[in-house]
Amino acid sequence: MLSNKKPLKGSKKLINAWAFYDWANSVYSLVITTAIFPLYYAALFVENNQIFFMGYQIKNTAMISFLTAFAFVIISFISPILAGIADFLGNKKRFMQFFVYLGSFSCIGLFWFDLNNIYTGLFLYFLALIGFWASLIFYNSYLPDVAYPEQQDQASARGYSLGYIGSVILLLFNLSLIMLPDFYGISGTPQEARFYAMKISFVCVGLWWLIFSQISFFYLPKGEKKIIQKKNIIFHGYRELKSVYDLIKKNF
């Protein structure tokens, strides 16, 4: 049973709760980004690799590359702004939760990604990418709040190891779904069964991410409110980036 008492900074419980978000979200980077979704996407367009978009025929691989690049542009632009707003409001947990829910539900929505829903599927892929990387920004910003400087390397390593273990476990399960669909009661032709199993793997990623992140959210603090003038909220994050850049220049 979870205790309502919030653990103190530097405590093993709080550091483990923070690191456990790696267990929750790393399945996205392994299953969606690396292993299964690229195979599903390629198989989807094996007969016709062209996507009609805004009056142009675009190759499917180029389309996903453009969409990924555009998502990273959006993330790089909004992240400092969101960081400034979160610092002003003192509630970065809410921002992190928003992007976790955005990403996880978008992954679940990929279940319906097929040739009849190309644009919806690509949009969900885009939202999942935004949710994943934006949530990591707030997740990483929590490290100084949960661990003292001498603990931070160990805490990061713990998160990395948990993420590796968790993502491999789910990947192995998803691969078993795809390779042995009959064992799990998935019917149809071999190709239909594999396609359906891949879709189920996207749902598994979304649910895994959504459910296990709740452990981190239960224990993580709300966030400390920083004293920032309202007129400086929007550009506060950019100013912090500049100060980091100046510090790097000074030391290197």
Which role does the model predict for each range below?
Residues 86-102:
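Cytoplasmic membrane-interface "Motif A"-like loop-to-helix N-cap segments
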Residues 145, 181-184, 213-229:
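Helix-loop junctions on the cytosolic side of multi-pass membrane transporters
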Residues 5-72, 118-122:
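Helix-loop boundary and gating motifs at the non-cytosolic
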Residues 2-16, 221-252:
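Juxtamembrane intracellular "pre-TM" segments in multi-pass secondary transporters
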Residues 156-179:
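Glycine-rich segments within core transmembrane alpha-helices of 12-TM secondary carriers
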Residues 100-138:
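Hydrophobic core of transmembrane alpha-helices in multi-pass small-molecule transporters
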Residues 195-218:
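Symmetry-related core transmembrane helices of the 12-TM Major Facilitator Superfamily/SLC fold
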Residues 124, 130-161:
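Cytoplasmic helix-loop-helix junction between adjacent transmembrane helices
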